[in-house]
Structure formats: C-alpha cells, structure tokens
Amino acid sequence: MLVRGHWQTGRVPERDLLVLTEEPLNAETRLDRQRGRIVPAGRHYVRTHFAIPVGPPEVLIKGAARAPRSVTLEEIRRLPPRTVTVTLECAGNGRRFLDPPVPGEQWGLGAVGTAEWTGASFHSLLPGDWLHGAVEILFRGADEGVPKDLGRRIAYERSLPIDIARGDDTLVAYAMNGEGIPREHGGPLRLIVPSWYGMASVKWLAEIRLLDRPFDGFFQQDRYVIEGAPLRNIEPRAVITSPADGADVYGRSLEVRGYAWSGHAPVERVDLSEGGGTLASTTLPADTAPHAWREFSLRVALDPGEHVLIAQAIDRKGNTQPLSPRRNALGYANNGARATRIRVRG
C-alpha cells in the first residue's frame, strides 16, 4: 500500500516494515527482516511527529550578532564530504513491552537501523568566529504541527551543545546509503548526530540558529526527557533476531544471532543466558565504525523442551544492558533485556 503518497522509496514493503501509524508516518523494521549490517532505506524504521513536509533545498543560518545567511544543498555538496556509518534508534524503542503501558508510539524492538550517511561536517558550514558567545546550536526541521497536549502549532526543533555539534562526525547529510536521502527519512538535508537517540538527528533541516542560552522548547523540555534531563546517548542493547520469539527449532545445536549497540562506546561483549546462568559469551573484535551496531552469533547446545534466552550487551566502557526495564513517564530509553522463548524439538 502507499502511505498517502509519502513513501519515496516505493510501496511500503509490508514484509519488512510494520506500520504503526500512517499520519504521521511511523513504521518499524520487522525483526526477522533485520539482515546485514547496513539497512536499505526501504527497510529502515521511520519516525515522524507531524505530516511529512517537502524539505527545503537550503538551510538558513542565524547568529546572534550576524546577518542571516543561507547555504544551499549544492554548496553543501561542494564541501569536503564525509561518510559515517551510524546506528539510529528511536528513544521510544521497546516501549510496547512496559507494563503497565505508558503513552507514546507503541514500538516493539524494530525502531532501530544502521545506514551510511554522507554529508558535510556541521562545523564546515560556518566560520569558527560565528560561535563566539554561543552556548547551544538549535536545529529546526520543516515539519510542523500541533502536539496533542500543547494546543498550538510548532516546528520540530532540538538543540545541541557546541562540542557535540562541532564533532567531525556530526553531519549535515544529503545521502543515505550512497543515494539522495528519501523524503520519509528527512531529505534533502538532515542532521545526523551519531551515538545519540534519533530525536537529535533533525529531519528536513530548514534552519540553524546559534543560541546564547539553553533551548527550552517542547521537544527539548517536555519530550525526550527523563526526570527533566534531555536524552542524549543511546543506552546499550542486544536484540536476538534469530531464532524468532515463539519459534520451534529442530536439533540441539542452535545458532543465536542478533545485533548489539551502545551510544556510550562500541559493544565489546554479548552474553547469552537462561534462568540466570550464562550459556555462552562472545567477545566482539575491534571495529572501524564506532557509531554502528555489531552483529553477533553464538552457538549453544540445548536439551529438548522450552527455553527462555536472554542476550545482554556490554560496551567497552563497562556499560551493561539491564535485565529489567527502567521505567519513566514516557517510556524512553527502555533497554531492558527481552526474553526470546523457543521450543527445541530433538
């Protein structure tokens, strides 16, 4: 089916994506269709807050004491290009499993995906002296609407600290997996903030503003916060993609596969357990893509019968995925380990 004409990559591939809502468009990747390190645009999850706009081909930049200037897509393309492999995860990924339920899109575990993003490092768009006196940089998208509990029309906008915005891998991107960014993924220009939850990677980028005080807008103070603190780095998580939850498997030797990621540091180990006892562990080798998920594979021998498998991610800084969810009012950063239940038939 077509989702109101927005799906630039063609018809919504229902075998790959589960559409939660059509307007605004929210769709997650089916776990059994997560294959390979790089997720094609048509299989990558989509998160929108309002109707999908036609993104502008230029970005307006405003400084406190500077005359506004516009930078066009073609001008950005002429800047030194940089390609970064980035895992983006919606902050609400896993919300569906909270009990009692909390408000928000009821994502399973498919609101995550990895792509190769190409663009210009943000810091190359403006001279360094523009940042004098700035404490944050605000990024506004072309998408606008009325949040249910706000009652007035606003644009989607988020700010970044100066040090994060100036990182080499923070991009104003114009390509996804080597092609122009599809409309549903924020093209033609999108901010990419590696290692942070996806809310920071503002889509349909329309305006950049240098601020002399912290931003306190709706999507910074009322949404994407836990106990008043705006969300930042992605928490560690491992997800089993094979075997599927509820599957019957044949033979006692079983390969367990999946993905693991963290926005604090690359994942270095995945533990597989059952009933509190470790079945197997794998140490992942060093990787040249620090902002991307890691594929893992573990082989275990299981007796016939029912089994409950749990995968846990541990990153290089020692951050460990919790076994239980950490509850908060809107169900953000719920990275509690999820059980995969299978039946082994000998």
Regions inferred by a protein language model and the residue ranges of each:
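Structured, non-membrane catalytic/scaffold regions adjacent to prosthetic-group chemistry
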Residues: L2-G346
